[in-house]
């Protein structure tokens, strides 16, 4: 009887530990998603960035030497018409409902479910985003969207953004999707180069380091070096929207190696964090 009771108790403990582990995995997104979807602090942060964007845009329109694409903007660009480059997801569109779905169903990101989410066309505008883009459009600045949404989602993306009131570019294709052309991979410099052929880029706004610099998938140390080398552009030509839910910051601790298990990925992230030593004994 004692043996049976011990076995039963052991089975219960194992089951509870498995449930706890699943709950812990699922909660990785909880605080970040709660902040972006529900907090006034996030709304204030986004509004602040887009308010600064208006100021920087006006400065850039006056200063003909100004460019937000230093690596791609070459030649006599000063007389070119003006444009800005914006990322879409978590820069202009709030996709936190997808994050919530993943948490509630204990799922991780997959292209299939993400594309289905895009097809639902339920993303909403980030606070301040639509107002800023309309302001830029009123200044005759061409709006280019360089996004790592896949090319097959372009129709749904356009329709979602049109419903919200974002300008679509008229007779110019302003949606530059990932893999729309063979050379348009996840790194965005090749697409920025397309824009700079015909436009002077005044601002670049995104939520991930990769929206600005192709070195985003390097080690944490190399990312920091790249960030430091770009220091003159942050807050001026380059503006960052806060996104704690996902991005290259999240994958850098485990070397962007997506073959690692969820447990290995989480361990790598915990291992790089600096901790207080605790109370003195």
Question: Where do the language-model regions lie?
Answer:
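Bacterial N-terminal signal peptides
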Residues: 8-17
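Second-shell loop/turn segments in exported
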Residues: 35-44, 115-123, 144-150, 179-181
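Substrate-recognition element of Asp-dependent hydrolases with the DxDx(T/V) motif
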Residues: 90, 129-162, 209
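C-terminal cap/substrate-recognition subdomain and adjoining C-terminal extension
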Residues: 40, 51, 150, 154-281
């Amino acid at each position: 009887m004692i043996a049976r009771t011990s076995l039963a108790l052991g089975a219960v403990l194992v089951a509870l530990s498995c449930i706890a582990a699943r709950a812990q995995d699922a909660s990785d997104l909880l605080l970040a998603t709660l902040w972006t979807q529900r907090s006034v602090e996030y709304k204030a942060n986004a509004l602040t960035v887009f308010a600064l964007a208006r100021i920087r845009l006006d400065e850039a329109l006056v200063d003909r030497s100004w460019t937000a694409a230093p690596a791609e903007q070459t030649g006599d660009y000063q007389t070119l018409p003006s444009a800005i480059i914006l990322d879409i997801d978590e820069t202009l569109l709030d996709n936190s409902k997808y994050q919530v779905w993943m948490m509630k169903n204990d799922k991780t990101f997959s292209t299939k479910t993400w594309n289905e989410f895009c097809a639902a066309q339920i993303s909403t505008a980030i606070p301040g985003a639509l107002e800023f883009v309309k302001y830029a459009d009123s200044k005759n600045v061409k709006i280019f969207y360089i996004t790592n949404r896949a090319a097959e989602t372009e129709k749904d993306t356009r329709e979602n953004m049109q419903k919200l009131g974002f300008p679509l570019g008229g007779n110019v294709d302003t949606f530059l999707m990932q893999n729309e052309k063979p050379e348009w991979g996840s790194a965005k410099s090749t697409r920025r180069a397309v824009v700079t052929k015909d436009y002077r880029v005044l601002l670049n706004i995104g939520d991930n380091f990769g929206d600005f610099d192709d070195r985003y998938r390097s080690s944490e140390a190399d990312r920091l070096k790249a960030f430091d080398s770009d220091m003159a552009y942050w807050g001026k030509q380059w503006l960052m929207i806060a996104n704690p839910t996902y991005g290259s910051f999240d994958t850098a601790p485990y070397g962007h190696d997506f073959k690692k298990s969820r447990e290995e990925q989480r361990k790598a992230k915990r291992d790089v964090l600096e901790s207080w030593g605790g109370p003195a004994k």
